[in-house]
Amino acid sequence: MESRDLNLRERQVLGIIIQAYVVSAAPVGSRYIARNCNLGLSDATIRNVMADLEDEGYISQPHTSAGRTPTDKGYRYYVDLIMKVRRVNDEEKKRIDADFGQLTTERRGSSSEVLLSAAKVLGSISRQLSVVLSPALSNAVFEKLDMVLLSSTRMMVILSIQSLIVKTIVMELDLAVSRQEVSGVVDLLNQRLSGLTLSEIRKTISMRLSDCLADASLINFVVRSAGQLFDETPIIERLYISGAGYIVDQPEFKQPEKVRDFITMIEDKFSVAKLVERNRIYSETVHPSRMEVSISIGKENRERKAEDLTIVSTPYYVGGMMGKLGILGPTRMDYGHAVSVLNYMADCLSATLSEVN
C-alpha cells in the first residue's frame, strides 16, 4: 500500500525535524519546534503531527529520547518534495574557481591532476567522502597513436583519446623491430582506426587490417594485443577519493566498529567506484533543481556496508564522454548543499578538463 501524500503541516514539521537533526545530530522534540520555528502551533498539536509521521514511518523515536529522528523514508520524502537547493555561496565558489583556475591558467594540470584536485576540493567543501570517476572509455573515440621504441624488443605505446585522455602502455615485443617499421605501422594504424570508438576497434581490428597481416610482423603483434591496447581502463584506475577524515569525525562514527566498517568499505575501491557508477534516481518524483543528480539513501544502496550512508552523485561531460562526481556520507546530510555543490563542481570540472586538454 502506497503512503498518502503529506499535508502542509506534516511537511513543515518533517522538514524542520530533518533540518534541525542535520545540524545538531540530536533527536528533535515538539517543544523545540513550538518554541523556535514560528509555525503558530501548540506543543500538543505538534506532538500529534509527529505521532502521525512516526506511525507512517517518516520519523522514529530512538531509545527513550523524547525527540524524533528522520528515517530513510523521511529523508526520501524530504529530498523529493520538500528540499530547497540553494546556490553555492561566494566563499565556496572562490575556492572552487581558484583551484581549477590555477590548473587551467598555468596549463600544468594533466587530466589526472584535475580529477584529483576535484576530489580534494569536493571533500573539503562537502565535509564528506568525495569520489570522482574519470569517463569510461568504451565509447570514447580514438584519435591517434604513437609508438616509441625503447629497445629492439620493448616499446611504449601512447594513445590519444578524444583529446581528453592519454593512455600510455609499455609493451614487451615477441620480435625485434626497427624504427622505420614502427613509423610505418603508426601511420597505418592512425589512418585505419582514427575516428572509431575503442569498442569498435577491439571488435573489428582484424578485419580492418586483414590485408596487412600476411607479412607485417608488428601489425600482427598489434592485432593480437588489441585487447590490452584498446581496452577499457579498469574502474579502480578511474577512481579518485578524498575526505575520509571528515566522515570519521562525525557523530555517527563514534563507535569503533562503525569506523572499522567504513574504512573496510572504502579500502575496497572497486565497490566504492561501483556504488557511485551505478547510483541512480530511486524515485519517480524528480526535484526540478536536482538536474541530473542521483541520490540513494540508506538501505536503497546495494552494498550492505553502505546501508547507513547516502550517496549523492551527478555526471560531468567532456568530449562527448561522461564521468561522475559523488559524495558519500551519513544519511544525516545537508542534501540541498550537497546537490548545489555537485552541480557547480560538475560544470567547473567539465570546463576545466576541456581547457586543460
Swiss-Prot record:
Recorded family membership? Belongs to the HrcA family.
Q: Which InterPro entries match?
A: GAF-like_dom_sf (IPR029016), HrcA (IPR002571), HrcA_C (IPR021153), WH-like_DNA-bd_sf (IPR036388), WH_DNA-bd_sf (IPR036390), WHTH_transcript_rep_HrcA_IDD (IPR023120)
| Gene Ontology molecular-function annotations | DNA binding
Q: Per the UniProt record, which residue ranges are transmembrane?
A: none
Q: What is this protein called?
A: Heat-inducible transcription repressor HrcA
The role this protein plays is: Negative regulator of class I heat shock genes (grpE-dnaK-dnaJ and groELS operons). Prevents heat-shock induction of these operons.
GO terms in the biological process aspect are: negative regulation of DNA-templated transcription
Which of UniProt's keywords are assigned here? Answer: Repressor, Stress response, Transcription, Transcription regulation
Which domain of life does this protein belong to? Bacteria
- Supply the Pfam families for this chain: HrcA
> PANTHER family from the entry?
HEAT-INDUCIBLE TRANSCRIPTION REPRESSOR HRCA
